[in-house]
């Protein structure tokens, strides 16, 4: 059990990739805490994990609100102690017109998809520095490398995560803290399914360009994230891990 007794905190852990990460790190022996906006689903998942013999703790929280994340951090550290590994997974889609999007909408979106990465890191880093060890995995997206029309400003936020990851990796490496990014391609999560419902033509379009002829399952992304949290990845720092089945290798 490569994460035995390690406290791993996952944002947006009640669904999608986050849910798969919570399960996978729990299976690896971690004490896993997670937050989510969906209180009912979060509590049910916590109960499910505990019934299976895992150490799990759920607390509700909106990553886009700093005070809520401060409360979340206080709750999870009270339950399991300092955070050893952080997975910044929470986020949402955006489909704005760059002219019609309001400043308030911009701020609300960026608070969730970009600023929250820094906020959670800021909360967890002091203990990691003191321990001279820690791991952070930031979930970006293949949209940081290439994107679709009418997806503004999702790609901007996901690209920003890569720069933030590099900054943190360079600054925190001397403290024994590794910071990496994961860039999933199309993954069959509720958020992606929601996108396909709103844009049904995109499902067949997405499948048509997939070199492997399918999309990823959340657990396939989670396995890489878990690896990056373990000592098996002890010299992996500041890296961008693209997990897209080869999609980004296409020219057209």
Across the structure, where does each feature detected by a protein language model lie?
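Alpha-helical segment proximal to the catalytic Tyr-Lys
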Residues: 126, 170-174, 234
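Short C-terminal tail/terminal secondary-structure segment
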Residues: 146, 226, 237-252
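Conserved glycine-rich cofactor-binding loop
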Residues: 7, 14-15
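Short, small/polar-rich loop/turn modules that mediate ligand/substrate recognition or access, typified
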Residues: 87, 173, 178, 236-238
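Residue(s) in the substrate-gating loop at a strand-loop-helix junction
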Residues: 141
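Active-site helix of classical SDR
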Residues: 121, 157, 165
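Substrate-binding pocket helix/loop in short-chain dehydrogenase/reductase
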Residues: 97-110, 206
């Amino acid at each position: 059990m490569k994460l035995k007794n390690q406290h791993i905190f996952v944002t947006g852990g009640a669904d999608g990739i986050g849910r798969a990460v919570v399960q996978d790190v729990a299976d690896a022996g971690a004490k896993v805490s997670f937050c989510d906006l969906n209180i009912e689903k979060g509590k049910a998942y916590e109960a499910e994990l505990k019934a299976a013999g895992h150490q799990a703790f759920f607390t509700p929280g909106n990553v886009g609100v700093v005070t809520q994340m401060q409360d979340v951090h206080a709750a999870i550290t009270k339950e399991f102690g300092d955070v050893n590994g952080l997975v910044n997974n929470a986020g949402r889609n955006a489909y704005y017109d760059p002219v019609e999007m309001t400043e308030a909408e911009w701020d609300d979106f960026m608070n969730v998809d970009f600023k929250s990465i820094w906020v959670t890191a800021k909360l967890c880093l002091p203990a990691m520095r003191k321990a001279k060890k820690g791991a952070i995995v930031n979930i970006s997206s293949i949209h940081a490398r290439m994107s679709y029309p009418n997806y503004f400003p999702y790609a901007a936020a996901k690209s920003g995560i890569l720069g933030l990851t590099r900054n943190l990796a360079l600054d925190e490496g001397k403290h024994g803290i590794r910071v990496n990014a994961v860039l999933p391609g199309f993954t069959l999560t509720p958020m992606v399914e929601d996108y396909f419902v709103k844009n049904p033509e995109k499902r067949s379009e997405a499948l048509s360009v997939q070199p492997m002829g399918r999309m990823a399952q959340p657990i396939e992304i989670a396995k890489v994230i878990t690896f990056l949290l373990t000592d098996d990845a002890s010299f992996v720092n500041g890296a961008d891990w693209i997990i897209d089945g080869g999609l980004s290798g296409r020219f057209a």
